[in-house]
Amino acid sequence: MAEVTAGTARLINVGVRYFAAARSAAGSDSEELTVRDGVTVGDLVDDLSSRNPELARVLLRCSYLCDGVAVHDKAQPLHAGNTIDVLPPFAGG
């Protein structure tokens, strides 16, 4: 995933992977997004929610991984090349 610069704003690419109900709501298993450098996981979730009301409902119940590590604080900044996994609650046993 490459970094690009537009004007004075530095933009970065991040990947988003959707699982289970999030995949169904998003209509895709993954996407790559170009975002402003310095956006947080919470900013990304807000943006995804604003684009798709069905996905917004699912995202309220999800947990997130950033490059395979649990996100405990949505104020965590994103960096070029990060991959965010969107994980709805799973049932199992």
Regions from the language model: what does each represent?
Residues 1-92:
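Ubiquitin-like/PB1-type beta-grasp interaction modules and other compact soluble beta-rich domains
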